[in-house]
Amino acid sequence: MSTNKERLIAALQEPLETTLTRYKTHLDGLKEDQVEENRDLYGENVITKGQEDSIIKKIYESIINPFTVILLVIALVSFITNVWLAKPGEEDPTTSIIIVTLVLISGGIRFIQELRSDKAASNLSRMIVNTATVLRDGSEQEIPIDEIVVGDVVKLSAGDMIPADVVLLDSRDFFVQQSGLTGESDAVEKACLAKADGQNLESLLESESLAFMGTNVISGRATALVLVVGDDTMMGAIEQTINTYDEPTSFEREMNSISWLLIRLMLVMVPVVFVINGLTDGDWLEAGVFALSVGVGLTPEMLPMIITASLAKGSIIMAKEKVVIKKLNAIQDLGAIDILCTDKTGTLTQDEIVLEYPLDIHGDLDLSVLRRAYLNSYFQTGLKNLMDRAIISRTEREAKKHDIVRDLDQTFHKIDELPFDFERRRMSVIVKDNDGFVSMVTKGALEEMLSVSNYVEYKGDIIPLTDDVRDEVLAEVAQLNEQGLRVLGVSYKSQLNENDVFSVEDESDMILTGYLAFLDPPKPSAAPAIKALAEYGVTTKILTGDNDKVTQAVCEKVGLDVTHILLGSDLDTMSDQDLAKAVETTTVFAKLSPDQKARIILSLKENGHKVGYMGDGINDAPSMKVSDVGISVDTAVDIAKETADVILLDKDLMVLEKGLVEGRKVYANMTKYIKMTVSSNFGNIFSLLFASIFLPFLPMAPVHLIVLNLVYDISCIALPFDNVDKEFLKEPHIWEAKSIMRFIAWFGPISSVFDILTYILLYFIIVPMILGHGYVHGSPEAVAFIIIFQTGWFIESMWSQTMVIHMLRSPKLPFIQSHPALSVVVTTLFAAVFVTSLPYSPLASLLKLSHLNGLYFILLFVIITLYMLSVTFVKHIYIKKYKEWL
């Protein structure tokens, strides 16, 4: 079988009939019985995104990350020092075993969450299907792109994603954006084989008659023959040879920043602890083991699992709310947006446009205007938008009562068309009636129709389009716009030659016959949704290509501030600095081109905003790409769905509000873990540094630090499912390493103060009371003193770490004003009780733990209570000073 390149070259060189015969197809498409044969012969239209990871690889990736690599190195060093280099009979692998167990538990939980996440993502991706229109057995069918086979004849129009590598059989003003393959930002015009001026066989990407999978139709229409599918396509070849690089999201960048910050801090603290203990005790081997254990205590090894669990849980919940997350990390970015830019149509309005009035130039009802509009909408083969459908629907209703609009599809047939594009903002069809008269009918934005018309028609008379008539038309249309009606102009020219080759230059010297007034009423949910988004700290800005008067009328009805509207023509004269100021004070932008929309979003981002963009059209794709979060709907054109990070199954701002809230919950619970864990761990390290300087022995055995870290991490498993205060959800939040360092600096030392208080009580009161004497270095009872002391701080550390979770998880009073999830209560209580019971369990001798007296537990209760009260007091000061919590 020929290679994909040979197939493409052959199609350019040989007669079309030869190509059709080779693939056993016809101009009217494949026969149904030939489809499966071609699929078996040439393969499926699916690009392999790299081989699916094996279970072994997934397990490896779940376990190995910067934090666990550090832990495994520590485990190895501990094994060498405590087992390999230990004296006979003194081998103790406990620390190494516990560290490895810690890594396996963290990795195992993450692996399970990743599997759940992958399954959820797979289920969600099946909800979003891109389709293509093919000819089979002579009739048009819309099928999923992955069902296309070599030999299929496909119909392409503006907004479509080209579904395979194809050769063009027929085309009209066909422009394709293929920057993803060539890097060329400008759209490229393509032509069918019969019209192409030669073919470039050296660089197939530059061929006029070939179009490639994954590129997008910007304007025009074409019929094409599928030559290459799936992995054999140009895009498939690229996917197989390079690793696709995705620009990290703001969330990913901040998480990487935080991870390396913690690693750097650990790399500083471990040597400091090692040197101090080595100089104090003189036992450098024991000091090394202890310093490594401190490293374990500083490592938030559950962070990857917490992130995965939070994102997976968020995506599943959001799917139930009709929000499909294409990229998991987009969940947090969605929650962080403070500005939502959106088009007007279908978002603020019902997306069910009704043609209210077909009017002549003086504003009187005129069915001849409807007649010509129908010819334009019915016979055009591009993307029939909502206004086309409204025109056809109104004509079908009127045809039951009026002969002038009856059987038009039988009375006329199409000769040619000039497809819509965003530069001209109009489209034309050339039709011939049964009497042989040929005419061009054009509809489009009124300003553009006036620019190509030199005459107007009124009650059958053709008169010049004078300035007075133009002013009358504009005044009439302005009144309609102020009522919220969208207006299109309709012009025509007749007595054309059907054998002519028509182009956009023929759209001139036309007769304006009238205009069409459409009603697209606001959604009942639009005003409440905009208000709700505002309550969550999100400003809604409207970016539309529509008329400013219509936009103003609709925006006023939904409660948006429209005291000032910025037009696309204004943007063209503004510098970047002027635009940066204007975007802050302007809510509504009208008559925009796609590039102007993207420029506004980039300006907002440069001003420090997190911007989401919601759209569903071809012209929305550039804006979605440059925004922080691209949002589309399942009914959008292919290019919009392909570009989006988030897809709504219901085009409603209320649905988006639910997704935004869930994104903030994900952020909140991940932030809780990071801030609470790191501040608590650093508090312990400061305590250890103090103890290393002033105590004649280690305050906690290395194995105690490891167990403490293991149990604490298990207690944090429920944090992704914790409740989040409603007040916290009202504002957008972004990740800041500076905020984490500030949090550590405020709350780490509080933990140290009460640890030191515990040292004093244990050293001078509790342990001497239990043993009947104080610490005597080198005495036989010194070992017992150390074990009891270490047991006391071991238990106090666990209680302080778990109970402070409830103090720090919310700025409010715990259990009274803010209630944690039951799972958080259960896991934290279990961790504290479990560690408290260890000295009385069979593990006591292995872990070198001892019983404690009743006075200890009374003082423990007092210390933990004072600690929680102190944290609450400092929390109040912190919030007052920095106006933030998590």
Model feature map: region roles:
Residues 1-140, 146-149, 154-162, 167-248, ...:
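Non-lumenal N-terminal regulatory segments of integral membrane proteins
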Residues 44-76, 118, 140-141, 201-210, ...:
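Soluble-to-membrane junctions at the N-terminal ends of transmembrane alpha-helices
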Residues 64-84, 100-110, 129-130, 260-278, ...:
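Alpha-helical transmembrane segments of multi-pass membrane proteins
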Residues 73-98, 261-299, 312-322, 501, ...:
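Helix-interface capping motifs at the ends of transmembrane segments in multi-pass membrane proteins
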Residues 95-129, 136, 246-339, 516, ...:
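Hydrophobic alpha-helical transmembrane segments
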Residues 210-218, 333-511, 518, 531, ...:
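Cytosolic catalytic regions of ATP/NTP-dependent phosphoryl-transfer enzymes
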Residues 273, 304, 311, 558, ...:
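Membrane-embedded transport module
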Residues 527-529, 535, 547-558, 595-603, ...:
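Acidic, divalent-metal-coordinating active-site segment for phosphoryl/phosphodiester hydrolysis
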